[in-house]
Amino acid sequence: MTFCIVKIGGSLIEVSRDVVRGLVSLSQEGDTFLVVPGGGPMADLVREIQQRYHISEDTAHWMAILAMEEYAHFLADGTGAELIDEISRPVSGVRVLLPYRPLMKDDRELLHTWDYTSDSVAALVAARLSADLVKATDVDGVILEGEVKREIPAEELIGKGTCIDQGALRILRRSGINCLVLDGRDPERFIASLKAGKGGTLIRGRGVGRSG
């Protein structure tokens, strides 16, 4: 049995519940998953409100965390996944994290800036649970100079604009957790890639990378 954290980005909202359904099906083989939701269009609205009304970074941060909770409810609805409001390994099946409550207790590793978004929350959760992290997004992987990288250290991506936020890269580097970035636009292909551990880009925190 394997366990991993799956971050599902808001960019996948059109197919995101199919991704969750695929995880639920995969969990019937004995695997367990903790889904960390993105912020989706709700977090985009928080950015707009901050720019328009000049709210503080702290307020925008917590509003964005609450936006993740809205997306969590969306992801769990009708998919067979269950909501959970604590950072813990599910005993079975698929759980979707409601992050506000556990982060209010302790979010010391998250700076309250837009460099630390839901990617950073997912990386923090993976670090706390010593678990692998998979980021489902709307690109084939980490793209540099027009090329999808098969594998790259987190250190090399710091300061570069890619599909994963800067805060997450710092957490990966500090914790040594790896993150597999996979294209989630085709849920069936995503699940197949996840099951095989192939495709996309492996961002290495520290230590060993892919075999073969």
Model-derived segments and spans:
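C-terminal catalytic "cap/lid" subdomain
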Residues: 1-212
